[in-house]
């Protein structure tokens, strides 16, 4: 069995005040000069999934995801990017395991900037850099996860999960960190009562100070 999906996602923050022109040339403050702008990230996702092996109680499946990214910061900056994700998942009667490679192509965003002469002057006088162009890179990461569903009775079960986020871009402030690989663990529990009531709890964002 195969599945094909198309998704469009938007994350945005609207009505952000732009105070670049707040101060007039005579150093007076004019609040009427405050305008607002929007920061938005758009992503077009093309997804494909395939069952590799299916039995009565188990299933092994594979999926790949291609994403086209468009980012916009008001009228100041825009970026286009592209990336790939892939994953493999095994599901048993009570257990499931998965591995996902995010940004396996090293997702990039190529930024371009546009400022008016007045905005450039304000940035210069306030000792800010005036960007021209840049490339933002998201390095590959590997996510490992597994879970087991414990039966506590005829109508109650407890699902326990453990995930590990592996990054390869140097030492991070995670519990397990090294110059080559850093590991960020995550734990979760879900109590299921009669398939009607669910209670979830989890813990993540374990950190340690980098010396």
Please provide the spans of the model-predicted regions.
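Subset of outer-membrane beta-barrel
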Residues: 1-211
């Amino acid at each position: 069995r195969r599945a094909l999906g198309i998704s469009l996602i938007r994350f945005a923050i609207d009505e952000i005040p732009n105070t670049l022109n707040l101060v007039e040339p005579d150093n007076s403050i004019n609040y009427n000069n405050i305008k607002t702008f929007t920061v938005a990230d758009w992503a077009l996702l093309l997804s494909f999934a395939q069952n590799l092996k299916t039995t009565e109680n188990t299933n092994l499946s594979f999926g790949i995801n291609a994403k086209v990214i468009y980012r916009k910061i008001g009228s100041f900056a825009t970026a286009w990017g592209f990336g790939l994700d892939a994953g493999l998942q095994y599901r048993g009667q009570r257990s499931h395991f998965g591995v996902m490679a995010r940004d396996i192509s090293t997702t990039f965003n190529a930024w371009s900037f546009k400022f008016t002469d007045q905005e450039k002057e304000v940035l210069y006088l306030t000792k800010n850099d005036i960007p021209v162009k840049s490339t933002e890179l998201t390095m590959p990461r590997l996510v490992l996860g597994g879970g087991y569903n414990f039966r506590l009775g005829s109508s109650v079960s407890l699902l326990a999960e453990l995930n590990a986020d592996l990054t390869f871009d140097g030492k991070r402030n995670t519990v397990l960190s090294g110059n080559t690989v850093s590991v960020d663990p995550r734990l979760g529990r879900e109590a299921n009562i009669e398939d009607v009531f669910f209670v979830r709890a989890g813990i993540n964002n374990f950190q340690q100070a980098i010396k």
